[in-house]
Amino acid sequence: MRRAALALSPQSSYTSEPLDFSLLSFMDHGDVILRFSDVSFSYTHNKPILKEANFSIREKAKLTLIGQNGAGKSTIFKLITGVLSPQSGSIHKRHGATIGIAKQVIPHHELDCSVHQFFQSSFTEKKYDLTRDIDRVLDAVNLSVPHDKLLNDLSGGQKARILLANALITEPDILLLDEPTNNLDQQGIDHLTSFLMGYEKTCIVISHDSAFLNCFTHGVLNLDAFTHTIQQYVGDYYDVVAEIAAQIEREQQQNARMEKSIQDRKVKINFFSHKGGK
């Protein structure tokens, strides 16, 4: 079933202020970690991504973000991280909540770092159990490399896995993954799936791998390219996609009936118009 969207008054900034849970009486207290309120965003005047979109995400939720190619899924991630700001409306995250997302490339100045140094740079303070944590996240992406190996000596696929593992190591409160299985073989996908199934914080994933998504997600955010809003659904991936497909079919049938009704009325009007003119 579709989850209700929030309808709240617009503001004009990205904030990390504590949420006003009194507005969310239909949810468990303290359960919401991220909320979009009447958010609108577009790159150009005639290409809107969002129009007054409203949705909220609970703590520990594991969700899939879907939408047509070019609808703006990666843009949603940039709005969540604060790389982009909404033109109107507001985006709230729970006070103190951290956000993690895998970088697309390793910064040039870090290529001379060792694997250990690269992971250490993700923390503001020295982490004494880092070796254990590195092993844990490298296992999550099915990668085995010496911790003293230079990043510059890794293959392109190994670097991609290092970047993914680096997003996991800080255990962010909101983990954003954009096509995380692209550089993984099946064993790597299995390892990542197992890691995410045990991940006890919020995770939002963009992926075309339906089997991967169906294993661990329990809800869908659907970015509608026509209404430029986000609809929320609860259920496993296959069930939700089937529900959305059925909904689209019902809407198409309804539109077809309406079109037929309009055409029938036009025929009657034309008939009586011609008859009256004789």
At which residue positions do the language-model features occur?
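Alpha-helical coiled-coil heptad-repeat register
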Residues: A5, Q252, E259, Q263-K266, ...
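ABC ATP-binding cassette signature C-motif
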Residues: M1-R3, S13-N255
